[in-house]
């Protein structure tokens, strides 16, 4: 059931979940149905990772990576995302960037640097935000919080299909191993570990189509 956001604030629906749970696709579909904006928070972490990789920074250099996040030069233009003036939409979906992003997402300095940048996306008429801690940390007063789950094998198959469709080589066994490692990092990190907010609706999409999952979210919103 939807709840009221803070007085004067635009309504927010948060969709959190592990890697390749479908949250990005669902967030975009729900936002389109409602005529709202969408925030892909994972893109900000991937952009930070890409910027750090371009500078040759190891993922273990927390202060340097946090400084990159603080000064991140990004621009979103519809489906396109630009890093330092260059279209980075393809690069940020590479597995190397995703694994780096998962590591640096545990750093308090990186998370704090990106926090207000994420909150700035909250504008009328409303926002659908997807990520890992949107409901628990970034938008704790969200009108509706969804935590999307799916079994890891299904998620690995989805990611493999997505990468191949984008012309990126992918190996299912490697993806499955990386995904299990990423899940462990995300759930065990000290800062904002991956977990549903106390008032979130947990939605298992393992046996659902995209359309069925979108409708389930909209049903929660309209309830």
Curated annotation (Swiss-Prot):
The EC number(s) this enzyme carries: 2.7.4.25
Subcellular location: Cytoplasm
A GO term from the CC aspect: cytosol
Reaction catalyzed: CMP + ATP = CDP + ADP; dCMP + ATP = dCDP + ADP
Keywords: ATP-binding, Cytoplasm, Kinase, Nucleotide-binding, Transferase
Amino acids binding ATP: 17-25
Pfam families documented for this protein: Cytidylate_kin
Highest taxon of source: Bacteria
PANTHER family: CYTIDYLATE KINASE, CYTIDYLATE KINASE/PANTOATE-BETA-ALANINE LIGASE
Protein's recorded name: Cytidylate kinase
Record organism: Bordetella pertussis (strain Tohama I / ATCC BAA-589 / NCTC 13251)
